[in-house]
């Protein structure tokens, strides 16, 4: 059956709200290569939206999941617990850069992790308010939609949203927003909208994902830490997209001296299996009463088995170092192109969490059309890219960190050709 035939079936069988970017259907995948039902091959620089830092079907991961399949697939951890969940929590506790002794709880999706981080913060503080940042993305459930700082397409027609959620600008040199602007906005909130002692949490992405890979300045993170300490507010770092070697360190927060109280994680945690988590200060994590946290599939044993292997792969294959090496090569390609491509307004990121932002050279305004044109032309040449950003004018690069050098070089050649065309 052809891609077009599957496409027609999709239109009839699934709602339009489940938007689909590609007009082809996956048949198989291995490492950084994706093959469709017609045999066409693509270099995958989307990786299921940052889920596959260890590549499609890493042999070690496949073996671990197969082994777990032979034992048991589900008990519901809250009913019958299992050792692998506890051991994974111990590993994350030892690795995560959070304040004090750590504890970890596992869930299923990134949105679920963020929801539970907010629950934990509210339980700990007894306060309702949450401050988030414009351009941030935290999920598609009602609380996480409220936290998300982008309207289209995530919020259209779905309101009203939960209350006691407030937004402040995220720093951006390109768009003229300084760290001081962000901090002044928080202080204005305290004066005009919600008193500081009613704020449970401040949540931020150290590198914004959907927002366009804007990197939080160290001064901002330090100031958030000071504000949280001063007012008894829980500091939450959302590492759903930035975690597990993507930024050249295991977590993006490893780039900063200041530690959050809670961190959320998901996506590449289990290499394609659905698993998320919240790790944080043990005193804060223990605030909810027994039974207050959990979920039927939370910490599923198949996904937990995969996560154990992901941590091993990152260490064994030096993927943090690999992320820095590949990211520098990508940055060099983009910076070189910027000299002759005036539409490239900025190149930014950490490690292999790199993005390029595009403006109309004539007006200087954000141009989603230019980003989409490059994306579509690259796809026609077999390179799968994603766009993002508040204006849809950013191309983000999320290749598996296990991609072979020759394949990465081939992708760079396609990118160079399409940027200069």
How would you describe each model-predicted region?
Residues 1-421:
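Conserved N-terminal phosphate-binding loop of PLP-dependent enzymes in the Aspartate aminotransferase
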